[in-house]
């Protein structure tokens, strides 16, 4: 009893650090390392729960997932070269270590925490009813970590008990610690076994105090994601129908289980998908299958803030500077009728006035010149990011201008990523936007719908694939059209529907950290006969290799105004500027609000059209990816499965290197991630 009280009062006075919301301080937990406590914690449900919560804390993804990192810069979403797309080859010496990382903070360290719990929980005095949901949550997180490893490497060592760190007699290759890489198939089998145990032991939903914990539906949805990945071309080069069937069965079961417990597609309608935008900032929504909650607390021991808001906001609004959207992403989004730009007969795409007549989600994904991007202290904050140039030659150079309408600092392209920011975000003079409690949704119900649609197409149920796509588009207000297809081409074959589903995922999940994994599992950087990869040709898409990222500069036409200095004092269009020229078509009175009623919105767009058409030209900024030497995306075939870093092989010489990579001694790797 004394030990129990010490744990309760000194270490875990309040439960659920990883799961708290921003509006309820009652559930704050002090972050403590819970890795070293003995088996007595398993005699009390609260201390055992605290151990589980510590595993959540170690395992939950960060709120800035989907930002500008090596993964997203390898896709169309962000500019710049990444480690995986630059001209120099990644080798065993400089490849990132996603395998062991650090002994205390890598995936196997987290798996060890799960194993320690599962090894010891049955030795305590808890009842079966108390133990079952605790064990089920830990089974989920063990499967989670193994699924990440398998996605990256293929087969990895399967360790299901907490190993003793003492080697004993002999060298490491003869130790019980020397666990070799299992086949990918064996790893998938173990992941599914853990997830089935999680599904069986978890409730379908939790009460408000425990909102954010893993449910049976979440475990089923992860199972569906894992099996869909295993059925995809990365792992399934011969297009084995049995794998698609397993993925279909798992995703159908996940969808049905989630729906039976109150989950589903949240309402995404409203003016230009206003309610869809709210999905990303609402702590409790039917869309959130796997979610990470945050708080607004500033005390280090209790703080769990989401850094996305601060990172995404422009410097003009006191943010860190924002995420710049590429021209490739801006031009990609469908038109208002759901058809691709250039394919719609009702809406003509104008690259200068790229904001006109777009998919409703466009206005919730991007922020551009003249659009209102509110926060709590300034509901009328309007983005202005045009540039001006000192002469004609500078204007046509494809480089940034010499003057900028963003006086506090600019983003690297004239369009911002707005998605996942909170229109009611609170700004403070001391913390700016850093105390954000906006949740991060790791898996939305929309993904379950599209996972099921893709698996349905995989087994030949094309109509079911169409229905999944239609459901996603219908819920954001895209019109069905005369053919009832919501802009989706009719009569597509299997590969054509795969292409449309991947396109829809690119729109629906933009800047959520999904695109890189979709490109990997469909091998969209190249076609390579040496590894039996022809998916780009099959789908009718251009490989991403050989491409460059571009920014959009909205430049003031030289015949209207040229200057060589930046700032308010040199901006002729800003009514607050000392050289404001009211005889020009200026920005006065322009504030395009996506929340406005349709008639008001169209009137606002007309004013913006006049400003753009009179004053601005679109310049493709080709300077954002490296030029010397000239960078073009170069994702090598061997990167589809990463190799082990040399320090891993030095410490664990029994681990075979992946095919395509050199082992520690410089010999070709022999481990085949595709071997059964």
Task: Give each language-model segment a name.
Residues 150-151, 157, 229-238, 460:
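Short coil/turn linking the two alpha-helices of tandem helical-hairpin repeats
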Residues 348-444, 661, 665-676:
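Flexible, polar/acidic helix-loop-strand segments at domain edges
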Residues 23, 107-110, 190-192, 272-339, ...:
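Long, intrinsically disordered, low-complexity segments
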Residues 23-67, 72, 352-356, 649-655, ...:
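Membrane-proximal, proline-rich intrinsically disordered regions
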Residues 17-43, 191, 224, 453, ...:
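Bacterial Sec-dependent N-terminal signal peptides
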Residues 286, 290-398:
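Glycine-rich, aromatic-lined ligand/substrate-binding cores of catalytic
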Residues 44-53, 57-58, 84-154, 176-189, ...:
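Conserved, well-structured interaction surfaces
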């Amino acid at each position: 009893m004394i030990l129990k009280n010490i744990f309760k009062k000194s270490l875990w006075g309040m439960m659920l650090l990883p799961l708290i919301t921003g509006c309820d301080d009652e559930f704050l937990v002090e972050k403590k390392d819970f890795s070293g406590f003995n088996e007595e914690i398993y005699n009390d449900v609260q201390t055992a729960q605290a151990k589980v919560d510590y595993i959540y804390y170690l395992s939950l993804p960060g709120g800035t997932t989907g930002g500008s990192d090596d993964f997203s810069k390898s896709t169309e979403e962000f500019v710049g070269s990444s480690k995986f797309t630059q001209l120099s080859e990644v080798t065993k010496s400089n490849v990132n270590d996603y395998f062991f990382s650090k002994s205390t903070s890598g995936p196997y360290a987290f798996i060890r925490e799960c194993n320690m719990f599962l090894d010891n929980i049955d030795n305590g005095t808890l009842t079966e009813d108390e133990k079952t949901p605790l064990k089920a949550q830990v089974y989920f997180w063990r499967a989670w970590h193994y699924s990440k490893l398998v996605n990256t490497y293929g087969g990895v060592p399967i360790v299901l008990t907490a190993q003793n760190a003492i080697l004993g007699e002999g060298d490491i290759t003869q130790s019980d610690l020397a666990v070799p890489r299992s086949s990918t198939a064996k790893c998938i089998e173990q992941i599914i076994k853990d997830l089935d145990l999680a599904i069986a032991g978890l409730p379908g939903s939790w009460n408000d105090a425990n909102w954010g914990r893993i449910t049976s539906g979440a475990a089923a949805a992860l199972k569906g994601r894992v099996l869909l990945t295993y059925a995809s071309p990365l792992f399934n080069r011969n297009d084995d129908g049995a794998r698609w069937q397993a993925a279909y069965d798992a995703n159908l079961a996940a969808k049905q289980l989630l729906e039976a417990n109150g989950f589903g597609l949240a309402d995404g309608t409203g003016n230009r998908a206003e309610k869809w935008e709210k999905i990303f900032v609402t702590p409790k929504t039917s869309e959130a299958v796997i979610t990470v909650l945050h708080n607004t607390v500033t005390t280090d021991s209790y703080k769990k803030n989401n850094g996305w808001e601060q990172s995404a906001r422009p410097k003009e609004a006191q943010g860190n500077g924002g995420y710049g959207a590429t021209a490739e992403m801006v031009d990609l989004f469908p038109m208002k009728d759901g058809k691709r730009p250039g394919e719609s007969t009702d809406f003509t795409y104008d690259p200068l006035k790229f904001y006109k007549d777009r998919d409703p989600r466009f206005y919730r994904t991007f922020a551009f010149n003249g659009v209102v991007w509110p926060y709590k202290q300034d509901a009328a904050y309007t983005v202005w990011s045009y540039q001006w140039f000192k002469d004609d030659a500078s204007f046509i150079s494809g480089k940034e201008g010499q003057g900028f309408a963003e006086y506090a600092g600019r983003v690297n392209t004239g369009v911002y990523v707005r998605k996942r920011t909170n229109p009611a975000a609170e700004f403070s003079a001391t913390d700016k936007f850093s105390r954000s409690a906006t949740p991060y949704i790791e898996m939305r119900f929309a993904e379950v719908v599209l996972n099921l649609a893709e698996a349905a197409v995989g087994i030949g149920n094309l109509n079911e694939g169409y229905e999944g796509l239609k459901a996603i588009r219908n819920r954001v207000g895209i019109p069905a059209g005369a053919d009832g297809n919501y802009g989706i081409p009719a009569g597509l074959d299997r590969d054509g529907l795969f292409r449309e589903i991947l396109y829809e995922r690119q729109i629906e999940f933009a800047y959520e950290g999904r695109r890189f994994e979709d490109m990997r599992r469909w091998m969209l950087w190249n076609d390579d006969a040496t590894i039996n990869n022809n998916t780009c040709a099959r789908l009718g898409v251009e490989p991403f290799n050989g491409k460059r990222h571009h920014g959009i500069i909205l430049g003031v036409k030289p015949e209207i105004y040229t200057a060589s200095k930046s700032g308010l004092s040199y901006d002729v269009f800003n009514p607050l500027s000392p050289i404001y020229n009211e005889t020009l078509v200026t920005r006065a009175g322009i504030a395009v609000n996506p929340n406005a009623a349709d008639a008001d919105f169209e009137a606002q767009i007309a004013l913006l059209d006049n400003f753009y058409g009179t004053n601005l030209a679109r310049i493709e900024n080709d300077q954002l990816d490296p030029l010397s030497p000239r960078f073009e995306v170069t994702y090598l075939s061997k990167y589809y499965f990463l190799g082990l870093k040399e320090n891993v092989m030095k410490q664990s010489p029994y681990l075979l290197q992946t095919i395509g990579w050199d082992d520690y001694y410089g010999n070709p790797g022999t481990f085949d991630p595709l071997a059964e």
